[in-house]
A protein has these predicted regions:
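N-terminal secretory signal peptides and thylakoid transit peptides that target proteins
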Residues: 1-16
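A residue-level marker of the well-folded mature domains of exported/periplasmic proteins
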Residues: 9-11, 27-359
Length: 359
């Protein structure tokens, strides 16, 4: 898709279909698996990238020859997502991969899917039913990592703001739990404000602006997402930029390299959008009988001021809202994706290799 604003991409519902290619014996597929992505929320750039890399993967081998893929958005509405899942069960899909609107509210319908022989894989905002496999990073550790770094930078004392995520999701709950674990060990740190940023830069900027004038000196920022928006609100209020622990937004990392003339000391931890592709690969391999039914935890990528690198982990020419962890890197990379896959869902050149943990 063309590069357009976040607001124009926010939608309460959406559906796409991708029937890509014919079965190819070279990739071991005699029939194509019907695999559907059920996404609860499309209101930020991370979710858009997550869907885009899923779409791009469907256009690349081995998925092109082995998978008929579809994707659906429910506007963060549990009832609507449940109805879409009901429709997928009726369509007799082979697998459902889901980024859920609620950790518990969809368990019943997902149990029905599993009872009909449909493979269910939950990623990012996972569900609690044991009938669904889980693909994720360690979200409690995510929150702890941000808070640990911040506590050290603040020498264990000072005022912190917490910018949280989408309420009611497992990711939001677990990240907050991780941070609170660290604050409990550092009684000198006071959380002076806790409010949602919805994992969205514009929302985080607006909500920060609305509370900032009433707050005392802020010595640290802990932010689940929308980090660059929080920093922009500080600049607009003529506040100094304190040490900041946040997500993998390109705009935040631009601040970390001082690209805009304002440099911040930070740690940027990423929840990789390619979790959708890892889930797709897990489904493909299980349906092919080449991988066991098991949960997968992958490491989350992160950078500090010492390790952030232009052209690899920050991109000055891309929008601030772009999430830089769209691909993995290094000798043990889970996968490698091109920028266009994340920007508009276009295929990268060559075959897409996704490395799952040892079975």
């Amino acid at each position: 898709m063309p590069l357009i604003t976040r607001r124009s991409l926010i939608a309460t519902t959406g559906a796409g279909l991708a029937g890509v290619g014919l079965a190819a014996r070279a990739f071991g597929a005699e029939k194509k698996h019907k695999i559907a992505l059920s996404n609860s929320y499309i209101g930020n750039k991370w979710r858009i990238e997550m869907e885009n890399v899923f779409k791009a993967a469907l256009l690349m081998e081995p998925f092109k020859s082995q998978v008929d893929g579809s994707w659906f958005n429910s506007g963060n509405d549990v009832s609507k997502q449940s109805q879409q899942l009901t429709n997928l069960i009726a369509e007799r899909v082979d697998a459902i991969i889901i980024d859920a609107a609620s950790p518990t509210g969809l368990n019943g319908i997902l149990n029905q899917a599993a009872g009909r022989g449909i493979l269910v894989i939950s990623f990012d905002n996972i569900v609690t039913t044991p009938k669904a496999l889980k693909v994720n990073t360690d979200q409690v550790k995510f929150g702890e990592t941000l808070a640990d770094w911040l506590a050290k930078k603040m020498n264990g004392k000072g005022n912190v703001i917490m910018v949280t995520g989408v309420a009611g999701t497992s990711v939001d709950e677990d990240r907050n739990k991780g941070a609170d674990n660290v604050w409990a060990k550092n009684p000198g740190i006071k959380v002076v404000s806790r409010y949602t940023g919805m994992w969205d830069s514009s929302t985080a900027e607006r909500n920060t602006s609305s509370v900032l004038n009433s707050l005392p000196q802020i010595d640290g920022i802990w932010c689940q997402g929308g980090t660059d928006g929080v920093l922009k609100a500080f600049l607009a209020a003529n506040r100094p930029l304190p040490p900041t622990a946040g997500e993998a937004e390109n705009g935040f990392r631009k601040f970390m390299i001082g690209y805009n003339g304002h440099k911040v000391d930070g740690i940027s931890v990423g929840q990789p959008p390619f979790l959708s592709v890892v889930s797709l690969e897990l489904a493909r391999q299980i349906l092919n009988g080449s991988y066991p039914k098991k949960d997968i935890t992958i490491p989350f990528p992160y950078v500090t001021n010492d390790t952030v690198k232009v052209g690899e982990t920050v991109f000055p020419d891309l929008p601030d809202s772009f999430f830089d962890d769209f691909t993995d890197s290094g000798p043990n990379a889970v996968l490698s994706l091109c920028e266009q896959a994340a920007l508009d869902g276009k295929a990268c050149t060559g075959t897409l290799k996704v490395t799952l943990p040892a079975a």
